[in-house]
């Protein structure tokens, strides 16, 4: 548009074909000289509106993870609550239309099928289900990640066949590693990749049990999964092992005394468009593992790097002892480990990228003493922090949780402080691992500017400023028209941020989705997201399915 206006201003009014051609040539010359191109002006962004919702009134324990089955036009959600553990449920999207919900916070216009107990199909003398962690669907094949009880024992994947009505028939179970936390079918449906977190025992302080993290690959041929998985662990990266020199120094090994294989904890899986590689987040380790699926092995470990909160673009709100409106500030010698949770891959102009939701996590629930401390309780190096007394006040950094094992000098004083998570999303070139974009403080700014004062003061938001802010939890990418959009779930803000990522180096914010008025009602804490392309949607337009961990609800947004 700029170039069109410029030509109108500097060229005479069009009176002939010759003048018209001259104007077009002049426009082309200017565009070439200044690097403009037709793609500089993005088409109008699509808008998402809430058209469907399922809430059974039970709250937590339902709908944490969601997947879509095209043939039956159904969503499948995990169910794991006290009276219905280790289960899943079908929610029908048949008959869904494009009308916005009239009372979105209270509405529940979707019908559900019976809850299916996975435990009843997999429990035997050698295995007791300890909960369902994730699910995914390829064609008519449903896969459920099931942790064992205790969680440190090897888990399994339960497979079901779905019919056109969404009825599920149990097929088989396949053993995998300890605590299968995330799983994903390859785009071609030929493999299922499972991230086995291998988390510390809940009673680690007394029993010392720390299983290895691992990645399982289950082949699928003609719609039937193999009886056995290929499971890869990280023992080759242990000290003195054959690949120990390949372990980047920037990959965080957090627990003193742990081997590399024990400390690396796979969390979430995404797979390249050509089904050749899996990208698996190692959240506690601030890294991503690249897995070759054609000749199964771990190719390399990619450290995600460090975020400098001394830069203005990375300012943050760091205290839960202040009242809104929150002021974002930058602090010298304060850094963040990205520690990605959710991950998604996408391709632009032949290049593969992955996008991560940089939530952060620690092991304090299991590891005693813990690995974090509040800044007010630390001895700060006077040269690095000449204003230490002021910084350690509760209304500044005093309440902020940081890693207590990083950034100390030889006297045990802290020269640098490292927080958990990036409070952001970032995009990486999948081939090189290089970060090509990072959202800085934008997610925090969006959250705090879009919530009113009463919501900002809620413990769900204010109470997390000293930890991980809005907590980017999950991310999916989908195509709407000719554009690619990322949907980033913010757990503590109970919101989803939509970005146009068609240009991976310069994403553009599009829309903020939130269906809660007081952080006590409506849809709370998005955990799992699933994108439904228009070609498979019951409305003919793309859909976003969102599972909410705290409210136990499922939301369906139409994007058009």
Description of each model-found segment:
Residues 15-37:
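Gram-negative bacterial Sec-dependent N-terminal signal peptides
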Residues 5, 19, 35-37, 44, ...:
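Intrinsically disordered, low-complexity serine/threonine-rich segments
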Residues 39-560:
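Beta-sheet-rich non-transmembrane sensory/scaffold domains
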Residues 5, 10-11, 34-38, 103, ...:
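Short, flexible coil/linker elements and helix-boundary hinge sites characteristic
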Residues 9, 23, 28-29, 189, ...:
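Intrinsically disordered, low-complexity segments enriched in polar/charged small residues
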Residues 1-20:
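N-terminal secretory signal peptides that target proteins for export/translocation
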């Amino acid at each position: 548009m700029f170039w069109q206006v410029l030509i109108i201003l500097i060229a005479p009014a069009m009176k002939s074909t010759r003048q018209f051609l001259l104007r077009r040539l002049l426009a082309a010359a200017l565009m070439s000289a200044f690097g403009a191109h037709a793609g500089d002006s993005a088409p109008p962004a699509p808008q998402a509106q809430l058209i469907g919702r399922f809430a059974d009134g039970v709250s937590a324990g339902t709908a944490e993870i969601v997947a879509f089955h095209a043939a039956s036009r159904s969503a499948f959600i995990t169910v794991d609550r006290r009276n219905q553990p280790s289960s899943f449920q079908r929610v029908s999207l048949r008959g869904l239309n494009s009308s916005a919900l009239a009372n979105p916070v209270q509405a529940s216009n979707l019908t559900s099928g019976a809850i299916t107990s996975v435990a009843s199909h997999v429990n035997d003398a050698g295995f007791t289900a300890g909960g369902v962690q994730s699910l995914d669907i390829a064609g008519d094949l449903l896969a459920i990640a099931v942790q064992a009880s205790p969680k440190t024992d090897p888990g399994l994947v339960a497979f079901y066949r779905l019919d056109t009505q969404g009825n599920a028939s149990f097929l088989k179970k396949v053993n995998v590693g300890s605590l299968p936390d995330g799983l994903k079918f390859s785009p071609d449906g030929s493999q299922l990749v499972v991230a086995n977190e291998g988390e510390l025992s809940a009673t680690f302080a007394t029993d010392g049990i720390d299983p290895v993290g691992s990645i399982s690959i289950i082949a699928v041929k003609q719609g039937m999964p193999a009886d056995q998985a290929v499971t890869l662990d990280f023992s080759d990266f242990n000290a003195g092992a054959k690949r120990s020199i390949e372990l980047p120094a920037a990959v965080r090994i957090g627990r003193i005394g742990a081997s590399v294989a024990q400390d690396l904890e796979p969390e979430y899986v995404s797979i390249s468009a050509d089904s050749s590689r899996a990208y698996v987040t190692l959240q506690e380790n601030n890294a991503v593992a690249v897995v070759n699926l054609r000749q199964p092995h771990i190719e390399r470990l990619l450290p995600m790097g460090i975020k400098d909160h001394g830069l203005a673009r990375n300012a943050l709100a760091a205290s839960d002892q202040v009242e809104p409106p929150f002021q974002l500030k930058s602090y010298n010698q304060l850094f963040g480990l990205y520690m990605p949770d959710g991950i998604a891959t996408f391709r632009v102009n032949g290049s593969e990228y992955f996008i991560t939701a940089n939530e952060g996590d620690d092991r304090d629930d299991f590891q005693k003493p813990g690995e974090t401390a509040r800044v007010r309780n630390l001895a700060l190096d006077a040269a690095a922090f000449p204003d230490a007394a002021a910084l350690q006040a509760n209304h500044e950094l005093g309440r902020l949780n940081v890693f207590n094992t990083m950034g100390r000098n030889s006297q045990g004083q802290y020269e640098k402080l490292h927080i958990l998570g990036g409070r952001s999303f970032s995009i990486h070139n999948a081939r090189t691992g290089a970060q090509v974009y990072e959202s800085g403080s934008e997610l925090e700014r969006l959250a705090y500017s879009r919530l009113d004062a009463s919501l900002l003061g809620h413990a769900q938001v204010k109470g997390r400023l000293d930890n991980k802010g809005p907590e980017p939890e999950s991310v999916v990418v989908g195509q709407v028209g000719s554009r690619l959009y990322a949907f980033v779930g913010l757990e503590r803000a109970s919101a989803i941020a939509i970005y146009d990522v068609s240009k991976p180096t310069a994403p553009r914010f599009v829309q903020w989705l939130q269906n809660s008025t007081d952080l006590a009602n409506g849809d709370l804490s998005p955990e799992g997201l699933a994108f439904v392309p228009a070609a498979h949607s019951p409305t003919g337009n793309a859909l976003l399915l969102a599972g909410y961990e705290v409210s136990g609800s499922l939301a369906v947004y139409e994007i058009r």
